[in-house]
Each structure stands twice: as C-alpha cells, then as structure tokens.
C-alpha cells in the first residue's frame, strides 16, 4: 500500500490521540478507483439480492422449499452488502477504522456470521438439488417446506453462535495475548485469532465445500444418464411423445437448475479459497501476508455476495422476468403475485 503515496511526515488515524494507528492511505487516483470498485460491489450485493428476495416472496409460483433456501441465501448476501462491505471499504482504503471499538466487534461478528451462513446455505442447496435430480419422484415428500425451514435455521444459528463465541468471549485470543496487545491501536480493527480457531474456521469452509463437490459430481453424472435415457425414450416411443416430451422438459428444467446452482457453488469456492488459504497460512507463519494481498483476498470473498444475482439473471429467465415486473412497478398491481414467470 505504501508504494502508492509519498508523504514527508508520518500520518496517524487520529493525530491528537496517543496510541493511534499509522495511516497509510492510497494516492488520490487509486483511492477514487477503489471506492468505485468496492462501492459498486456493495450496491450490487444489496440491490441484486434484494431483487431475489422480493421475487421469491412476492410471486406465488416461486414459493417452493428450494427457492426459500435461495431467498435465505440472498438475505445473507444482502446483509453482507449493507452491513459489512461499506465499512470494510472505508477501512481498506483509508487504512483506519473510524467507527469505534464496539462497532468493530459487531462488524467483525456480522462479517463472519453472514459469510459462513452463505456457505451453509449453498451446502443445503446442494443437498436439495441432489435429491431433486437423483430421486425426483420422492423429492416433493423428502424436501418439504418444514425441512427447508430446518436447513435455513441451521444456516443462520450455527454461524451466529460461532461468530459470537469468537468475538465476544475472548477464547479465540488465548495464547496470543502478546500479539493482540502489540497490534492494538486506536483506529484499528484487525481480527487476530489463535491457530485452533483458524483451523475451525478453515473446517467451516472446507467441510461444506467437500460436501458440495461430492454432491454436484454425483448430480452431473446422474443428470447426464437421465438425458441419454430420455432422449432414447422419446425417439423410441413416438406414440407417447406428448407425455415423454413433458418428462423431458421437467428433467431438463431440473438439470438446468442444478447447473445454475453448480455455477454458484464454483463461484463461491473460487471467491473464498484465496482468503481461506491466506488466513490459514498467516496463522502458522506469523502473519506474513502483505496488506495489499490480504485486501485482494478479502474483497474477492466479499464480491461473492454480489455474484449470485448476476448468475441467476444470466441462467434463469424467470428471474429476468421478475426483475422487469419489479422495476416497472407492475408488482404493485392486483393479482401480480399469480403471474406465470415460466411462460415462454
């Protein structure tokens, strides 16, 4: 970061305060660019995920266990965009925390909770898609609204309990008190946890990721087999073309849903892997990562919260139609909730 500016005197976050952190701001050009890039990510995360939530909750055709999971995932990403990214943006660019120690703890707690909540949501969505594709006949009875509600509850409660334990009990700093004290200064909001909790954090990312990889590998194998069977059945039974054609459309829709959510999972892993590896390496190598590398890894993870609505808009025609209805104000009309979003 220091390579981007040149100042004859040392700058502090709080000039007239003892123990202030050193300020290492960017020069005006890069500073403006970073505010635009980070700000765009926050706005996209807020607006895009809000559109997803409104779409699922308003249109009755989208009231399904799977879509409730997607809406809950969008809620987590929305909260990242509105309560985490704006303040992290200021901290990253100004290299100072101007919002007080109490809000630093709350901000860090929300950061971890909402991000890990996204990971658990994606894991449960993978389970949902696995059942839908591999056992479609019993899927409606296996993955019900109540089951979806349980998955959503777990996806929120576990991350909130974990993050509260990390930032409000002090147990994550045991054994590294001297390091925490050395890094402590006025105007700083740096999260430092011991190796045990870093390993726990890594497992919270690694285990859901492995589950998702295994399930989606099986999903695409089964989907490929189903596609071949349906194609063979349709070509060999012309007399039942209408029925078989309907089955083919249903199977195709399920495969497309699995593919879309598979892209979402890949985007999550690509976005979060650099940060997760960096955090693990830092904990065991004495925090050797340069500040600018850490910021790149951190914002790569944050930007994942803005990606999902773009993925839905690209792959889901119903979401594009819902966006048009919302932005045009047509959802305010009577009976708009019964609009057929799947019509061609």
Curated annotation (Swiss-Prot):
Reported effect, residue 272 to A: Abolished trace-amine receptor activity
Location, primary (coarse class): membrane
Expression tissues: Specifically expressed in neurons of the olfactory epithelium.
Disruption phenotype: Mice lacking Taar2, Taar3, Taar4, Taar5, Taar6, Taar7a, Taar7b, Taar7d, Taar7e, Taar7f, Taar8a, Taar8b, Taar8c and Taar9 show no visible phenotype or behavioral deficits. They however show an absence of aversion to low concentrations of amines such as 2-phenylethylamine, isopentylamine, N-methylpiperidine and cadaverine.
Subcellular location: Cell membrane
Transmembrane segments: 32-52, 68-88, 112-132, 147-167, 196-216, 261-281, 283-303
Segments on the Extracellular face: 1-31, 89-111, 168-195, 282
Top-level lineage group: Eukaryota
Membrane topology designation: Multi-pass membrane protein
Gene3D superfamilies: Rhodopsin 7-helix transmembrane proteins
Variant or mutagenesis effect after changing residue 21 to S: Decreased trace-amine receptor activity
Keywords, alphabetical: Cell membrane, Disulfide bond, G-protein coupled receptor, Glycoprotein, Membrane, Receptor, Transducer, Transmembrane, Transmembrane helix
Pfam families documented for this protein: 7tm_1
Consequence the record notes for mutating residue 111 to A: Abolished trace-amine receptor activity
One Gene Ontology term, aspect cellular component: plasma membrane
GO terms of molecular function: trace-amine receptor activity
Keyword Transcription regulation listed: no
Alphabetical list of SUPFAM superfamilies matching this protein: Family A G protein-coupled receptor-like
Disulfide bond sites: 21-185, 104-189
Function: Olfactory receptor specific for trace amines, such ascyclohexylamine (1-MPD). Trace amine compounds are enriched in animal body fluids and act on trace amine-associated receptors (TAARs) to elicit both intraspecific and interspecific innate behaviors. Ligand-binding causes a conformation change that triggers signaling via G(s)-class of G alpha proteins (GNAL or GNAS).
Domains (record comment): In addition to the well known disulfide bond common to G-protein coupled receptor 1 family, trace amine-associated receptors (TAARs) contain an unique disulfide bond (Cys-21-Cys-185) connecting the N-terminus to the extracellular Loop 2 (ECL2), which is required for agonist-induced receptor activation.
Annotated family: Belongs to the G-protein coupled receptor 1 family.
Name the record gives this protein: Trace amine-associated receptor 8c
Lineage: Eukaryota, Metazoa, Chordata, Craniata, Vertebrata
Gene from which this protein is expressed: Taar8c
